[in-house]
C-alpha cells in the first residue's frame, strides 16, 4: 500500500537486502548486500546526517537558520546538505579536492556551500580547515568522526533491519568498510549480542592500512581508510581485518554493474571484494552480508567508469 509521508526525512532507512546471483563462485557461500543507495540521498550516510542533526536539535544546540559545517569525503556532506535543506539550515561542506566531481555537484545542488582542501592533506586537512571556519562563523560541527549519534543510529536502525531480514537465515559473516567506523561499530554491537556466531570483518584500503598498524597513504577507495583511527570506531567490534587494493575495489565495482545489474561506488567495490573472499573461505551453505554504501552514478567522472567493463565468462 502506498503511503503519504510528511517529510522526506521519513524515508531514511529500511533499505533492501538482496542476494547476489552472478558474481559469486558456485562453491562459495551466499552473499547478500544491503543497498544503502535506496536512501533519499543515495547513501548510508543519510542515516547519520539525520541522526546527528536531530540529536543536536534535541539538545538545543541548533535550530533552523543556524550554520552547519562539516569535513567529509562526500557522502556525509550530501546527507547533511539535503537534510539541512529540508530542515532550513545553512550548510557548508569541506572536502579534499580529490573527491569526485559528482559529489561536489550534488552537494551544491542541495543548496550547500562547498570548500575544497588540498588532496595531499587528506581528511586531516579538511578537518583542520573546518575547525578554523567553524570558529569564524560560529557554526555547529556534527563531527561525524567523534559523534556518538553516528554508531548509535546504526544500532537503532541498520542492525535491527539486518536482524529482521536474517531471522530465518543464519548470518555467518558481516563485512563492512571502515570510514568513520560508525556502521561497523553500531551493527557489530547488536550482532555480537543477538548473533554471537557471526564473524565481523573490517575492510580497509591496502595502501592505507592504518587498522592493521601500517602508515597512512594515498589510495583510490573514496569513503574508507581516512588515514587515522576515528573515535567512532570501536576497534573491538571486529574480529578480522581484510585489506583491499584499490585496483581490486575498482574492478569489483565495475563488474557489479555488468554482472548484477546495479551500479555501485568504489567503497562498495571494496566491501564486495572482501565479502566474496570471505564467501570463498566459508564455502557453500554459509551466508555473508555486506553493506554497499552508495551508488555508482556519483563516480561516473572518475576512473571507476572511465574504462570499458570486461565481463568475466
UniProtKB/Swiss-Prot annotation:
InterPro entries: Cys_synth, Cys_Synth/Cystath_Beta-Synth, CysK, P-phosphate_BS, TrpB-like_PALP, TrpB-like_PALP_sf. Its EC number is 2.5.1.47. The modification N6-(pyridoxal phosphate)lysine is found at residue 45. Gene3D superfamilies: 3.40.50.1100. Residues 215-220 are annotated as: SAT1 binding. Pyridoxal 5'-phosphate binds at residues 75, 179-183, 267. GO terms for biological process: cysteine biosynthetic process from serine. Its cofactor is pyridoxal 5'-phosphate. It catalyses: O-acetyl-L-serine + hydrogen sulfide = L-cysteine + acetate. The keyword Amino-acid biosynthesis applies. It comes from the Bacteria. Pathway: Amino-acid biosynthesis; L-cysteine biosynthesis; L-cysteine from L-serine: step 2/2. GO terms for molecular function: cysteine synthase activity. This is Cysteine synthase.
